Amino acid sequence: MITVNPIDSTTFEVIVEDNSTTTHKVTVTPSHYEKLTNKRVTPEVLVERSFKFLLQRESNTSILRSFELSEISRYFPEYEKTIQEMLK
């Protein structure tokens, strides 16, 4: 289960409950949000779907505890294209 709680307009606390529970702090810059979503979904939805993307590739305990959403592409080059498809 993925729970996304806004801390402020660009920062979110994400709690992932799986075999173990992890907490993550994620920052989403307005420009990256707009690039990925064209404002079709809320930042919370983008973060939640991004965690679904990550969990298909690694365990929640392997996900960085604090990161900017744009960093995902450094580890998974297919992220931007895939997340845009997931948000259609």
Question: Whereabouts are the PLM-identified features?
Answer:
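Non-catalytic effector/regulatory segments
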Residues: 15, 87-88
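Beta-strand/loop nucleic-acid-binding surfaces
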Residues: 25-31
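A short, polar/proline- and glycine-enriched secondary-structure boundary/capping micro-motif
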Residues: 24-25, 37
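Short, surface-exposed linear segments at secondary-structure transitions and domain or protein termini
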Residues: 31-40
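Short, charged/polar N-terminal "headpieces" of proteins
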Residues: 1-23
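Acidic, low-complexity intrinsically disordered segments
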Residues: 40-87
